[in-house]
Amino acid sequence: MKNVIVTGGNGFIGSSLIKKLVANGVNVVAVDITFAGDRLPESEFITKIESGVDVSLAKKIPSGEYDAFYHLAWRGVNGADKADPTVQLANIQMAVDCVNISKQLNVKKYLCAGTVAENATFSLPNLEKTSGGMMYG
């Protein structure tokens, strides 16, 4: 791999991934709404784009060939937003937008993260009541 795109680049998982990629000489376009803090090192291998993730992102990414698109951006991972269907549906739209951006940019591979809460849906038919904590059940 030579060139990749990472959304959520300043988050816990995204910044950890970027550090590993850079250590292996991979050029990274890191996308996040902010790069406040010291999660990412200054590096010639990292291009930072401060932006939300929507269809307009494609125009902000430098032209070139990309081997992978890692979609790790996600809102509402804890607190009240975790149970807010509006926030979670916006996350789903963001993932769909990233798939379309990947296609538009001819990215070779698209990778995204899921949530442990998805596993709860497998037991839903057997539940007597739902937890009410998340939109999954």
What label would you give each PLM region?
Residues E42-S56:
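Rossmann-fold cofactor-recognition segment
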Residues G52-A90, I101:
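NAD(P)H-binding glycine-rich loop region in Rossmannoid oxidoreductase-like domains
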Residues V26-G37:
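Conserved glycine-rich Rossmann-like NAD(P)H-binding loop of the short-chain dehydrogenase/reductase
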Residues T7, V31, F69-R75, Y110-V116:
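SDR active-site strand-loop-helix element
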Residues N3, N27, K108-K109:
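Residues at the starts of beta-strands that form the adenosine-phosphate
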Residues V96-M134:
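Conserved Rossmann-fold NAD(P)-dependent oxidoreductase catalytic core, especially the SDR/UDP-sugar
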Residues V4-N24:
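N-terminal Rossmann NAD(P)H-binding glycine-rich loop of SDR-like oxidoreductase domains
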Residues L40-P41, G79-T86, T121-P125:
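Conserved catalytic-core motifs of eukaryotic protein kinase domains, centered on the activation segment
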